Amino acid sequence: MACPAHGCVKDCLEVELDKNMKILIVDDFSTMRRIIKNLLRDLGFTNTVEADDGTTALPILNLGHIDFLVTDWNMPGMTGIELLRHVRADEKLKHLPVLMVTAEAKREQIIEAAQAGVNGYVVKPFTAIALKDKIEKIFERIG
C-alpha cells in the first residue's frame, strides 16, 4: 500500500518534519547563530530562539517549550557537551533531540558526544543540505 503523504511504496523514507517545532540554537558566536537560523529558515523552520551558551540555554529549556536543540561545543560558561549532559540527566528534557554543530572534528570528541547522548553531529562549515540531512536522520531514528 502506498503512503498517503508521499505515494511511497513499502517503507516511506520521507520524514514529515513539523516546520513549526521550536528550535533552540546555542552558540557563543552571534554570526554562527544567525547562519544556523537562516539555514533553518531556508529549510522552512522559522520558530527559533537563541542562547549564547549553555548557562543561558538551560532556563529556556526548563520552560519546556523547546522541541529540538542545536548547540555548539566550545562556548564559555557552560559548553555544549556540558549542556548535553544536563539535558540527558534531566527527567523532563532527556528525550529532547540534540544536534551538535561544531568545529570539533576529532574522533575522540565525536565519540564523547555520542556517549553523552547526542542525536546528530555536524562539523562546521556545513551546507543547508547537510543540515537538512542530519535533522531528517535524527527524526527518522526517534520516530
How should these model regions be labeled?
Residues 50-59, 80:
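Helix N-cap/capping motif at the beta->alpha junctions
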